[in-house]
């Protein structure tokens, strides 16, 4: 797995892809930030970053999985995206700037599930 196997999505590009109906699926992999937040990216699925290996299989096939976190340098997102790629998911990406960039830009959020 190389860094260039993981696409980098700017928040503006992910927001535009939603409007165009592109086959993308945001995946929230925040840890403490998730517990402390009451919101997530609109239509995001959630996997626990401490248990991601067992939860990746439950994510939809046929869509590019866009992982986001709130760690500097997308550290958690990149780790999980690289693992997913190495384990058969050919379309993976990370949201540049993660949750904070998405929220700061004012893009759609929703109450987190559960």
Predicted regions and their residues:
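Conserved beta-strand scaffold positions in the cores of enzyme catalytic domains, especially
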Residues: 26, 44-46, 92-94
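A generic "binding-loop/recognition-motif" signal
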Residues: 31, 52, 98
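Glycine-rich nucleotide phosphate-binding loop and flanking beta-alpha elements
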Residues: 33, 53, 73
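Short, structured coil segments at secondary-structure junctions
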Residues: 40-42, 88
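Short, hinge-like loop/turn segments at secondary-structure boundaries
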Residues: 43-45, 109-113
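Alpha-helical scaffolding within the catalytic cores
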Residues: 49-56
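Catalytic cysteine-centered active loop of the rhodanese-like fold, especially the PTP/DSP P-loop
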Residues: 56-102
């Amino acid at each position: 797995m190389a860094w260039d196997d993981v696409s980098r999505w700017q928040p503006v590009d992910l927001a535009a892809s939603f409007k165009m109906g592109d086959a993308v699926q945001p995946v929230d992999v925040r840890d403490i930030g998730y517990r402390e937040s009451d919101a997530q990216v609109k239509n995001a699925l959630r996997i626990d970053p401490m248990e991601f290996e067992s939860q990746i299989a439950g994510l939809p096939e046929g869509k590019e999985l866009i992982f986001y976190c709130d760690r500097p340098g997308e550290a958690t997102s990149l780790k999980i995206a690289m693992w997913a790629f190495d384990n058969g998911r050919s379309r993976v990406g990370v949201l540049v700037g993660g949750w904070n960039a998405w929220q700061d830009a004012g893009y759609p959020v929703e109450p987190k599930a559960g």
